[in-house]
Amino acid sequence: VHRRFEILGTPDGITVADDFAHHPTELTATLNAAMKMGFNKVWAIFQPHTFSRTAMLLDDFAEALKIPDQAIISAILPVRETNTYNIYSTDLGAKVPGSVCLDTFEEITDYVCKNAKEGDLILTMGGGNVYMCANMIYKQLKYMEENK
């Protein structure tokens, strides 16, 4: 099924995958499964989808994002909303100890590619265009592997 734990590849021993999970229940189920798969470290890169959903489910998202070894939170994808909720990805990050908030996919790609190790799982999650970040990470890791 497209965008359900879809594995892009394993460049340099680092597995890159993408999942459509965009609700706390889906995040929890997917992350609990990932944590049982034997990876050295599970990285969850989450793109919150809409300001209203993020505001309404903030605490539930935070609980889900405490499951992986490392949570990275991108900027909230507004879709057709304006931020009348005055909520930001850093509000979610503040509730997830050790999380990192990075606005752009470029920043996330740089951070992950500098810090991920062989045996890790990089899992992008969200209902928006975060799959593009998975593609960027995969391509950068592949490039690094080929140019050692």
Regions flagged by a language model, labelled:
Residues 1-148:
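ATP-dependent carboxylate-amine ligase
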